[in-house]
UniProtKB/Swiss-Prot annotation:
<dbReference type="InterPro" id="IPR035236">
    <property type="entry name" value="ProQ_C"/>
</dbReference>
<dbReference type="InterPro" id="IPR016103">
    <property type="entry name" value="ProQ/FinO"/>
</dbReference>
<dbReference type="InterPro" id="IPR036442">
    <property type="entry name" value="ProQ/FinO_sf"/>
</dbReference>
<keyword id="KW-0694">RNA-binding</keyword>
<dbReference type="Pfam" id="PF17516">
    <property type="entry name" value="ProQ_C"/>
</dbReference>
<dbReference type="GO" id="GO:0005829">
    <property type="term" value="C:cytosol"/>
</dbReference>
<dbReference type="GO" id="GO:0034057">
    <property type="term" value="F:RNA strand-exchange activity"/>
</dbReference>
<dbReference type="GO" id="GO:0033592">
    <property type="term" value="F:RNA strand annealing activity"/>
</dbReference>
<protein>
    <recommendedName>
        <fullName>RNA chaperone ProQ</fullName>
    </recommendedName>
</protein>
<dbReference type="Pfam" id="PF04352">
    <property type="entry name" value="ProQ"/>
</dbReference>
<feature type="compositionally biased region" description="Basic residues">
    <location>
        <begin position="127"/>
        <end position="141"/>
    </location>
</feature>
<feature type="region of interest" description="Disordered">
    <location>
        <begin position="107"/>
        <end position="153"/>
    </location>
</feature>
<comment type="similarity">
    <text>Belongs to the ProQ family.</text>
</comment>
<keyword id="KW-0143">Chaperone</keyword>
<feature type="compositionally biased region" description="Low complexity">
    <location>
        <begin position="117"/>
        <end position="126"/>
    </location>
</feature>
<dbReference type="InterPro" id="IPR023529">
    <property type="entry name" value="ProQ"/>
</dbReference>
<comment type="function">
    <text>RNA chaperone with significant RNA binding, RNA strand exchange and RNA duplexing activities.</text>
</comment>
Length: 212
């Protein structure tokens, strides 16, 4: 005997029902309400069919009858049908109301899910459109004619200068505050010595404030 492969996928079982009972299970377009107790008829018809089990049939039937397409067909004036497509009586109002409520609830859930997905995807889209700009480090403003700062001069090894020993372009140290500041002599007028400090600042000092 040839072994028949059992169907386990719900979509595959539905496709099998569409093919086996085309007047009852409608694959496309408007469906028709099914007879109450149709599952028992279905189980009996397929009792010798090894392709499907009762459990899988029940799952497939639930999928079919809970689809929006099926719930929309459960309306006033519609006739229930059996496995062969024969009419089995009109729907009761209770069943029509239940189908309408189930359809609305299912559609509301689907809408809420779409809204939630759109909200969660929106920040990512904005981030993708507007790349984050890296902060640009500002360069410190340089004073005109500024030069790299040199190590502070140790005053212990310096001695006060004599005016006669000084001359333009000579590197000297000027006593300003506690620490001497290095610079270059620009000009000498009488007792005033004009010095440009390494910081770029130009000052006039007396010879006694200059250290060598």
């Amino acid at each position: 005997m040839e072994s028949t492969e059992k169907l386990t996928d719900t979509n595959a079982i539905l496709a099998y029902l569409y093919e086996t009972f085309p007047l009852c299970f409608i694959a496309e377009g408007e469906t028709k309400p099914l007879k109450i107790g149709l599952f028992q008829d279905l189980a009996e018809r397929l009792a010798d069919d090894s392709k499907v089990s009762k459990t899988q049939l029940r799952i497939a039937l639930r999928r079919y009858t809970s689809s929006w397409r099926y719930l929309k067909c459960v309306k006033a004036g519609a006739q229930r049908i059996d496995l062969d497509g024969n009419a089995c009586g009109e729907l009761e109002q209770e069943h029509i109301d239940h189908a309408a409520a189930t359809l609305k609830e299912s559609q509301d859930k689907a809408k809420a899910k779409r809204v939630a997905q759109a909200k969660s995807a929106n920040p990512a889209a904005k981030t993708a459109k507007k790349p984050v700009k890296k902060p640009v480090a500002k360069r410190p403003k340089q004073t005109q004619s500024s030069k790299p700062a040199k190590e502070p001069v140790v005053a212990e090894n310096l001695t006060p200068a004599v005016l006669a020993e000084l001359k333009p372009k000579q590197r000297v140290n000027v006593k300003l505050g506690k620490s001497p500041v290095a610079g270059v002599i620009l000009d000498i007028k009488k007792e005033d010595v004009q010095v440009q400090l390494d910081s770029g600042l130009t000052i006039k000092v007396r010879a006694e404030h200059i250290l060598l």
